[in-house]
UniProtKB/Swiss-Prot annotation:
Keyword Transmembrane helix annotated: yes
Disulfide bonds: none
Record localization: Cell inner membrane
Name this polypeptide is given: UPF0266 membrane protein KPN78578_23010
Major site of localization recorded for this protein: membrane
Length: 152
């Protein structure tokens, strides 16, 4: 096994750890889930570039008669990229004391101001940053509003 294979394995393990944390660990942290809302995806261009470059590496490894283990590892890396960028749905998870947004825990008392833009984006102003929450279904904004009213 070459150094390149070890680096690819490290990347696969890092992506796998992130996927496991996002799907299984994060919903169980900080209390029960009160509401989980799917969000709109950001640009898929980054994921397309990652998977495309990985496909180029697979092609290059095959044409240069590279080792089979490297080809398989690159294929697993491409599949992890497909899962993370296209299959996995980003979501905001509301808990009794706060919520997870982009895998970051935010307490409710950090919210200084909330606004709703014309295009259906919920804007939450925190102490030093602004969160732009783009929900997939516009009706979910009412669910978020009702939840925030009952918890505050």
């Amino acid at each position: 096994m070459t150094f390149t294979d070890l680096v690819i394995i490290l990347f696969i393990l890092a992506l796998l750890a992130y996927a496991i944390y996002d799907q299984f660990i994060m919903p169980r942290r900080n209390g029960p889930v009160l509401l989980a809302i799917p969000l709109l995806r950001r640009s898929r261009v980054d994921g397309m570039i990652f998977v495309g470059l990985t496909a180029i590496l697979i092609y290059n490894n095959i044409t240069q008669h590279g080792t089979a283990i490297t080809t398989w590892l690159l294929s697993v890396l491409a599949l992890m990229g497909l899962y993370l960028f296209w299959i996995r749905t980003p979501k905001i998870i509301f808990k009794p004391r706060g919520f997870f947004f982009a895998n970051v825990w935010i307490e409710y008392q950090r919210i200084k101001e909330m606004n709703l833009s014309e295009d259906g984006v919920l804007v939450m102003q925190l102490e030093q940053r602004r969160l732009l929450i783009r929900v997939r279904n516009i009706d979910d904004l009412e669910k978020i509003y009702k939840l925030l009213i009952t918890t505050q």
